[in-house]
């Protein structure tokens, strides 16, 4: 290629750099962010034990039975359960699957991760209900609160244990998820009708309790949980009420 | 600890911060490699969802953007394989977006779409090099890392790619 051509091309390359750069549309930015934050968490499996070591576990029979039940549930209604929302008959299978997942967790830290992942899924259910099926909003809120309370109970167990890398990682994961959930719930609250505010404010309060517990991790910098929904009084309806008072809750 | 390490450890807020930082770069890559804005949006979403799943396997010594571009190149290639034959580029330009913006924005986007149509006439490796080297203004060394080709190869291809792009833009302008 001649010098003349090279100079022309260099000039052309400079012109290219001056082209206006398209950027992601705001709607994509917001929706994709919300969907990434609500996506189920990938939990890294704990290290594999030697095959014979399994037989020394006292809960082996229970775990095997649970796995069998899980397989039966998966075969019977896996796809229906996967696409079901709280309030659907098939959602009972989802809940049963969640309980078995927690039951077969190797230790409390893994169980906490599992419970956090389940609460992520319940938050996604809540967002799906708001977007596509408002009639499922109340049961979805109740299921979300129940899932968060299970995280809270498991977190209390893990916090009481001596520090290990796995324990601290699980608590850090719960703390991160909790902060994201509070932000997501506050965004949801802004879009909800007045009669659904009771449940969502209660959900925010429960999640703030979880976040408060994670602040007790030694060495963790104090970071206040996001406050209650902007523009709403902190002692709004639902504070201190039992979650059983929620509409749609069994 | 940096954001990518924290994200690899499961910190979703760290991943969200990385998303905020790199979304536009990934979107632009998809925008220039694909035919329509809608496809670019779909692929951008797919890239970040795949990145989220792959985070536990992320190697922190590698730049995070290179990790994202690696996923983006695969997703774009998969998408193009699945979509073939697709709508013509004339259609893509004519129906690029259903949402008209202010005049100035629309004019700027029209330029970007004309450039996209011209880039589509290049070979896939030329497209990558034009996007990374001249539109994203990455160094030859970075482009070599992103594409897995030696720097000398990049330097050779980039001149041919520029010449081809200039010709393609010329013929786009005559339409």
Language-model segments: residues:
Chain B
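Short, Lys/Arg-enriched C-terminal cap helix and immediately downstream tail that follows
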Residues: 81, 122, 127, 162-175
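Structural recognition of an alpha-helix C-terminal capping motif at a helix-to-coil junction
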Residues: 42-49, 62-74, 156
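Internal acidic/polar
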Residues: 78, 86-108, 112, 139
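A short pre-motif secondary-structure segment
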Residues: 129-133
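Short, charged helix-capping/linker segments at alpha-helix termini
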Residues: 6-17, 27-46, 146, 151, ...
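Short amphipathic alpha-helical boundary/capping segments
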Residues: 2-6, 114-122
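Residues within the DNA-recognition helix of helix-turn-helix
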Residues: 22, 157-162
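Arg/Lys-rich amphipathic alpha helix in sigma70-family domain 2
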Residues: 32, 53-60, 70-90, 108, ...
């Amino acid at each position: 290629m001649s010098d003349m051509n090279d100079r022309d091309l260099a000039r052309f390359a400079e012109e290219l750099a001056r082209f206006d750069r398209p950027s992601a549309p705001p709607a994509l930015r917001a929706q994709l962010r919300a969907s990434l934050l609500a996506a189920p968490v990938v939990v890294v499996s704990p290290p594999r034990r030697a095959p014979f070591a399994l037989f020394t576990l006292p809960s082996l029979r229970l775990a095997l039975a649970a796995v069998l039940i899980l397989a039966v549930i998966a075969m019977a209604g896996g796809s229906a359960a996967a696409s079901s929302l709280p309030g659907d008959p098939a959602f009972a299978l989802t809940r049963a699957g969640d309980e078995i997942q927690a039951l077969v967790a190797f230790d409390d830290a893994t169980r906490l991760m599992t419970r956090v992942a389940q609460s992520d899924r319940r938050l996604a259910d809540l967002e799906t209900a708001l977007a596509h099926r408002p009639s499922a909003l109340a049961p979805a809120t109740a299921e979300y609160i129940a899932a968060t309370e299970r995280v809270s109970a498991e977190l209390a167990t893990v916090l009481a244990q001596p520090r290990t890398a796995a324990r601290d990682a699980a608590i850090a994961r719960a703390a991160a998820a909790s902060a994201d959930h509070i932000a997501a719930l506050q965004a949801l609250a802004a879009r909800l009708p007045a009669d659904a505010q009771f449940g969502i404010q209660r959900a925010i309060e429960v999640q703030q309790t979880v976040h408060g517990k994670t602040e007790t991790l030694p060495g963790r910098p104090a970071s206040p949980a996001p406050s209650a929904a902007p523009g709403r009084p902190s002692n709004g309806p639902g504070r201190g009420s039992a979650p059983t008072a929620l509409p749609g809750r069994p | 600890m940096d954001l990518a390490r924290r994200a690899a450890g499961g910190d979703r807020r760290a991943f969200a911060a990385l998303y905020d930082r790199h979304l536009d770069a990934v979107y632009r890559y998809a925008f220039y490699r694909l035919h329509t804005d809608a496809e670019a949006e779909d692929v951008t979403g797919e890239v970040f969802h795949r990145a989220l799943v792959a985070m536990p396997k992320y190697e922190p010594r590698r730049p995070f953007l290179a990790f994202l571009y690696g996923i983006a190149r695969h997703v774009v290639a998969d998408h193009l394989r699945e979509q073939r034959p697709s709508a013509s580029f004339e259609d893509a330009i004519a129906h690029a977006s259903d949402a008209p913006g202010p005049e100035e924005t629309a004019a700027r986007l029209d330029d970007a779409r004309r450039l996209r149509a011209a880039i589509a006439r290049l070979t896939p490796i030329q497209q990558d090099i034009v996007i990374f080297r001249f539109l994203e203004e990455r160094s030859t060394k970075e482009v070599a890392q992103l594409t897995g080709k030696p720097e000398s190869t990049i330097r050779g291809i980039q001149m041919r790619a520029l010449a081809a792009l200039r010709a393609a833009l010329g013929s786009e302008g005559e339409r």
